[in-house]
Amino acid sequence: MNYWLMVVIFAGVYADGTQEAYVFKDPHFHTLNECVRNANDPNEIPKYAKKLVAEYGRMMQIQKVVCASQDEVIKTFGSKYAIGDPA
């Protein structure tokens, strides 16, 4: 099964042209619409912000949040982002 994952892309660009990003493996979603709804849900956003602060020790400026298929995430960030048995 191919899941959908929420990916936070932070503002700012490193000298090599890359950007810092965070992939939420939990929760993961079964459809794109489910991911988008969750990413825009005012009741859920504080949970994601809290997780980011726990990871980075501070709130980082966010450029954008996207929902990407597990396959796209694995191609971009590597197999450590696989969830269960890939489709």
Predicted regions and their residues:
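Hydrophobic beta-strand residues in large extracellular and virion-surface proteins
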Residues: 5-6, 35, 65-67
